[in-house]
A protein has these predicted regions:
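N-terminal leader/targeting peptides and immediately adjacent processing regions
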Residues: 1-46, 197-203, 210
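Non-catalytic, well-ordered alpha-helical scaffold segments
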Residues: 12, 49, 53, 81-85, ...
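Generic structural signal for hydrophobic core residues of well-folded globular domains
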Residues: 21, 39-43, 55-62, 90-95, ...
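Short coil/turn segments at secondary-structure boundaries
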Residues: 30-33, 66-73, 101-105
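A glycine-rich, hydrophobic loop/mini-helix early in the fold
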Residues: 41-79, 84
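Hydrophobic/aromatic-rich, well-ordered segments within soluble, folded domains that form packed cores
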Residues: 73-103, 109
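Basic, alpha-helical nucleic-acid-binding regions used in initiation and control of genome expression
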Residues: 99, 105-113, 117-203
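Non-Sec secretion/translocation targeting segments of pathogen effectors
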Residues: 211-241
Length: 241
């Protein structure tokens, strides 16, 4: 037994749980899911609810086009909408430092070894399954919008976002902004002719607009002969679910 029933789940305890799962289970995601589920059954239902809100708050705080760009490069086969959701769950499972560093600089993912297809969809289901077993009700009956917002606001206080993280980038631009990640995961063919690889749905107006802004920021950076500016804290709030 690793946990005892006690109230007071917070961000530090959440990350301790995630870190311990990584220590115990390594890269075995199925074993990690089983282990985390076992630990949650030793907790109070109130703490299980808090964990649920924290998992989804961290997932939503990572919904950034720049990280999505990096995920597609790291996965080497591109990254769909659902794939990016599962990638963010996988990123959470790598622990606090890897998660926060990836948002501060997605290029830091060059130092993270991919495994399990960089996908951990089941992490999002564990708390709801445990809560349902404990309370005989759906967790969303008790997870209020106010709780979710409070959880999200707590989460983003610790996050420093990379200045280019809002922008979806095609490979030529990604090679400028995330050079180490591209060096690790792009094929020689892709590195030689990155303009031939298309990863974004440019039929969407919002994607085209954000790509244009990102390209303009890169052009300005190159004209000034400077490296990517230091990451700055973002005050923009994401989606709370």
């Amino acid at each position: 037994m690793e946990a005892t029933k006690q109230n007071g789940m917070n961000k530090d305890q959440f990350w301790n749980l995630i870190g311990r799962a990584k220590e115990v289970c390594g890269t075995d995601l199925e074993a990690s899911a089983v282990w985390i589920k076992q630990q949650l059954f030793y907790m109070t239902s109130e703490d299980v609810l808090k964990i649920h809100n924290l998992v989804y708050s961290y997932r939503d705080a990572a919904y950034k086009y720049g990280l999505w760009t990096a995920a597609g490069i790291m996965m080497e086969t591109g990254c769909s909408d659902d794939g990016f959701s599962d990638f963010r769950m996988w990123l959470i499972a790598q622990g606090k430092d890897v998660y926060l560093n990836a948002l501060k600089d997605p290029d830091s993912l060059s130092g993270v070894t991919p495994y399990g297809y960089c996908s951990f969809e089941s992490l999002g289901y564990i708390s709801s399954q445990v809560y349902s077993a404990m309370k005989r009700k759906n967790i969303y009956q008790d997870s209020t919008a106010k709780m979710q917002m409070e959880s999200y606001e707590q989460v983003i206080r610790d996050i420093v976002y990379h200045p280019m993280i809002e922008y979806p980038l095609e490979l030529p631009e990604a090679m400028v902004v995330y050079p180490k990640l591209c060096e690790c995961h792009l094929s020689e063919q892709a590195r030689q002719a990155p303009q031939k690889v298309k990863t974004w749905n440019v039929s969407r107006t919002d994607i085209r607009r954000m790509m244009a802004r990102g390209n303009a920021a890169i052009k300005k950076m190159q004209e000034q002969g400077a490296k990517a500016p230091e990451a700055a804290r973002s005050v923009r709030k994401g989606t709370v679910r």
